[in-house]
Amino acid sequence: MVRYAATEIAPAKSARSRGSYLRVSFKNTRETAQAINGWKLQRAQKFLENVLEKKEAVPMRRYAGGTGRAAQGKQFGVSRARWPAKSAEFLLGLLKNAEANADAKGLDTGNLVVKHIQVNQAPKQRRRTYRAHGRINPYMSNPCHIELILTEADEVVQKSEAVVREEAHLSSRQRGARVRRAITAA
């Protein structure tokens, strides 16, 4: 069995998928993966399909040197965004594979969340390009390994009103007044 980077996730309530030595840009795939991390499965799939149709853009945060600006990046609070189609296709394939694995395990596919997604660099593939005056330059590709884990979303439990009132933010002056009242009342 292959080791995943996230080990604390319960295997009974999760489904995994991974791809190794994928010939797709590491930098673009990393940015695309970070965009969908923590999202519900259906929303992540819809987002990647929209990226392929150029209806939504992937925010470029870390590897953004030379990236042009796109208005579609505003929803993520960035100005630099792109539409990495090949990365979106590879991630869509892995999401579909993980969904099928979850279905085979008997998990509720409508309640799945992208809990962990990680993109690592694979060994570079070397080719050559021929330049003027008989020189040769490297023509490298930067493949990657991708792993992702889907888990069933936890049920959201609403706090009681008494707890919410107790947790209300008080300034130091208000806390002091509350303590003085409690002391004089006792």
UniProtKB/Swiss-Prot annotation:
It is found in: Cytoplasm. It holds the Pfam family Ribosomal_L22. Disulfide bonds: none annotated. InterPro entries: Ribosomal_uL22, Ribosomal_uL22_CS, Ribosomal_uL22_euk/arc, Ribosomal_uL22_sf. GO terms for biological process: cytoplasmic translation. It comes from the Eukaryota. GO terms for cellular component: cytosolic large ribosomal subunit. Component of the ribosome, a large ribonucleoprotein complex responsible for the synthesis of proteins in the cell. The small ribosomal subunit (SSU) binds messenger RNAs (mRNAs) and translates the encoded message by selecting cognate aminoacyl-transfer RNA (tRNA) molecules. The large subunit (LSU) contains the ribosomal catalytic site termed the peptidyl transferase center (PTC), which catalyzes the formation of peptide bonds, thereby polymerizing the amino acids delivered by tRNAs into a polypeptide chain. This is Large ribosomal subunit protein uL22. The gene is rpl-17.
